[in-house]
Amino acid sequence: LPIFSNPELRFRAVVVSRRETNFDDTEEMFQKVYYQVFNNWLDRRDSYRLFIDRRIDERDRVDTLRRCLIDTFQFGNSVKFVEEVESHENDLIQLADLFIGALAASRNGHLQLEGSSAAKLQICRDICQNLNTSTLASYETWPSEQKFNVFHFRGRRNM
């Protein structure tokens, strides 16, 4: 998998359990989780170009996020732009989708179901081997992990 051999590639994922949060809707969850991710993970000395997978059903999503990250100056000049892209147009988003699918399948128990994708199972095994872990089902890291970071968000409704 290219992420493990390329020092410039990093993957960060946030796992959110609906049972452990109390958001009014998925849009509120998206905005608050993304804000916390960027607030805690962006190094303000670096510069970032953020690409968000386009969702047809949430038209204002990226504009709101852009206002929070760029227009408020809370992140200084570190966030250069936030752009919506179609995942099939961006190789890095496709790679992230692959990793997210592996994490979701592992955490939701789908890999144990009869008829599970052999390819997805192999990807999970490859990731586990590179991370030196036996499963992705409960895999979590500290925020300081640089290569393959998985954070379990345990938020409250009023942040």
Where are these regions (language model features)?
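Phosphate-ester processing/binding pockets and catalytic centers
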Residues: 1-159
